Amino acid sequence: MMNDEILRINGFEIVEDGFDQDKNKYYEGIFTQGNGYFHVRGSFEEGLADAPQNEVYTRTMKSVTTEQQRHPLSKQGTFLPLMMGKHPFLEEVIINLPYFMRIEIAAGNEKLDMIRSDIRDYRRVLNMKTGELTRSFTWITASGEEIDVKFSRFASLDEKRLFVQQADLKPRKGTPYITVKSGIDAGVTTNGYCHFTESSLFEKENKIGVTVKTDVGERASIMCENQLRGLDAVCHTELEKTTIDVIYEGALTENATLVKYSVLGCSRDRTEDYIKEMKECLEQTARLEYKQLLEKSKIIWEQKWKDSDVLVEGCQKLQDSLRFSIYHLLRCGGKEEERIQVCAKGFAGEAYYGRYFWDSEMYLLPFYLYTDPLSAKSLIGYRYWTLEGAKQNAQRYHCRGARYPWQSGLTGTEQCSMWEYADNEVHITADVAFGVMHYYFASGDEKFLFDKGAEILLETSRFWSERVDKGEDGEYHLLNVMGPDEYSPMTRDNGFTNYMVKFNLISALETLRLLKEKKPDRYREVMEKTNTLESELEIFKKIADSLVVPYDEKRKLYLQSADFEDYALIDMDSIWKDKKKAFGHYASQEKIYRSRCIKQADIIALMSIFPEKFTEEQLRVAYEYYKPLTTHDSSLSPAVH
């Protein structure tokens, strides 16, 4: 999957042998750590001198497939999914919080830097089974001294607020006079924009910390405590405008170890006093050794892997890819929080702005359903939490009911700035309904279905009853829609969308029938709360029975859309010079929109969801027809095929 000259997967370990500055930013995402409550990118503790984190620039609304983003050598990231801000162009975005992992080291006047320093025997390892990241190397200073350096760190699964680091320094040659600077940097930006309206740095007793106020009035705080052993050092604190550091200076005559305990919290936490909880957590955990805290976390990781690991025989590449994916899904899962989902980037960076897409229900939910049902319940519970936002979206389009946004944040209102996706990619609403039913079928959680799912299914069906158009043929149609294939933006009767809408409507009717039979009082409550009459349910049934799903009986072919074959067949190979890059880099959007080229699985995706509904012949015909036309420019596509 990702194996290259220096990066490989060995069992449960992601191993980097050697440093490549050109791939560093990419690797930072791969080495991301987290525990569901917060996540940190795999950036170096000491940073890179040539990669400032406070750059201000403008990022505008563009397609994420073809956008040429800025690519600094490093992009640090500290993310609390609950902390989102308001960007002037990009709407609601996740905020990159102050960088608290900073541990800078200098020997004399020479600062440790992976690019500028003489580094030997470099190795970085992420143990996916324990969540621990280690990095070791030998540093040859300009004056000829040699120091063995090892950094270790983990996000605790035992204490959700806790992140622990350890820096080990061992003199190999000479007696270098070293400076260790451990601190917090609040001078960071998110997509080139500063979301902090206030920043308060503080030092109290043996702790340092920062509280920032965001542009939407929420606050986030980080506190750190440092413990140094083995170095007879002079210690002082340095406070500047956006940074605070504890600085140790002394001659490195023996092995020295710095342990840094950090805790995070925010005003959106469901607690009366999150600052008090942070202090208590820091006081309790800072009494324990790094290894003790790691062992507590490892026990939980062990159980997670016991519930989730997949063994593959005969294909090591697939085995490695699965474990890599499972690791990141495990760190993202959250059993206790319905106000968030798992964002498209997995909280490993600023791309996709920390927002939630159809990926959640269609690609992520199945994993959690069969390995961590409580996280699955929270994932789909988010859609009930944001049901009011979905109703507001429908009202924007002069429709009743609930229209879930293509890109969703904390409020559940539409965050997508590009009209072709926001207006047309309406299948997300039916995907949410599918997620509700998938959770119910897998879990048997009738209480969730009746308490929350029924309202989601009813309100989404109500939206569809107003979004469809009745044609002269007497059938119902969905016009001007974009299915999963985002290279076909304004189609007529997209097969995936229409099939999913029929499922949405039928599921609503069946759920309400079951509710009326088993919980008549709750049935009346739902009908009254949503102002629904029995006659409206009859409309749902008519639409479900008559909504067109394009099918060519002669060829046994389900069409991606009724007008799919009106578009031009093009010689994709002659255009696509380098298939390591997206097809979208070689063809203009206008060219793509008028051609039969597919960004990602569409009809094939539908068939993978409902395999029992299609014959083997229909599956084969569709696969052979659509595969040559599919670019896989979306990472969601290959797995389906």
Identify what each model region corresponds to:
Residues 314, 348-358, 416-429, 486-498, ...:
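Solvent-exposed loop and edge beta-strand segments that line ligand/cofactor-binding
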Residues 333-348, 374-434, 440, 447-450, ...:
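Helix-terminus loop motifs that line ligand-binding clefts
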Residues 459, 463-532:
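Acidic/histidine-rich catalytic neighborhood
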Residues 102-104, 111-117, 315-323, 360-405:
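Carboxylate/His-rich catalytic cores and anion/metal-binding grooves
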Residues 306-311, 328-332, 362-373, 431-446, ...:
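Well-ordered alpha-helical scaffold segments within catalytic/enzyme domains
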